[in-house]
Design a protein with these regions (language model features):
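Nucleotide-sugar-dependent glycosyltransferase catalytic core
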Residues: 5, 33-57
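A short, conserved alpha-helix in the catalytic core of glycosyltransferases
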Residues: 2-31
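Non-catalytic, C-terminal membrane-associated alpha-helical segments of glycosyltransferases
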Residues: 50-58, 68-120
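Short alpha-helical functional segments enriched in proximate histidine and acidic residues
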Residues: 62-63
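Residue-level recognition of short, structured coil/turn motifs
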Residues: 22, 67-68
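A broad structural signal for alpha-helix termini and local helix breaks/kinks
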Residues: 43, 66-67
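Residues in flexible loops and secondary-structure boundaries
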Residues: 8, 12-14, 35, 40, ...
């Protein structure tokens, strides 16, 4: 599913395999090597934003796909005003990584909300 960035694609794949009554074998010794090397984003704040934004969006989207998103969405929706406040306060206190963290989660929630409202 192209809506996943990275974090929940394995869960989605396993869920679809199990749905088709197939088995999944986990090999603990297996290793994967990324051909492109290191992360291309060098800016520390961008890394924080990208990681938390995509993780939050992927989590919400995965639970939406399995029709189990209502509780996750409700809990995050309650936190959004606090996240906005914390983002602003941390920005003024020059705790930029914390500010970016809360901003990324807020933005992911709004993107997810936009997606599900478009699908209604």
């Amino acid at each position: 599913d192209e809506n996943f960035f990275l974090y929940y694609s394995d869960f989605d794949l396993c869920r679809r395999i199990l749905k088709k009554k197939k088995t999944i074998i986990q090999i603990f010794e297996a290793k994967a090597q990324h051909d492109h090397g290191e992360i291309k984003v060098k800016n520390f704040l961008k890394k924080i934003f990208i990681r938390n934004y995509n993780f939050t969006f992927d989590e919400l989207y995965y639970f939406f796909k399995i029709n189990n998103h209502h509780e996750k969405t409700r809990r995050l929706k309650k936190k959004i005003p606090k996240y906005i406040t914390k983002s602003i306060i941390n920005l003024f206190l020059l705790r930029l990584s914390q500010s970016v963290y809360y901003f990324s989660k807020t933005l992911a929630f709004y993107r997810f909300n936009k997606l599900i409202n478009k699908n209604k």
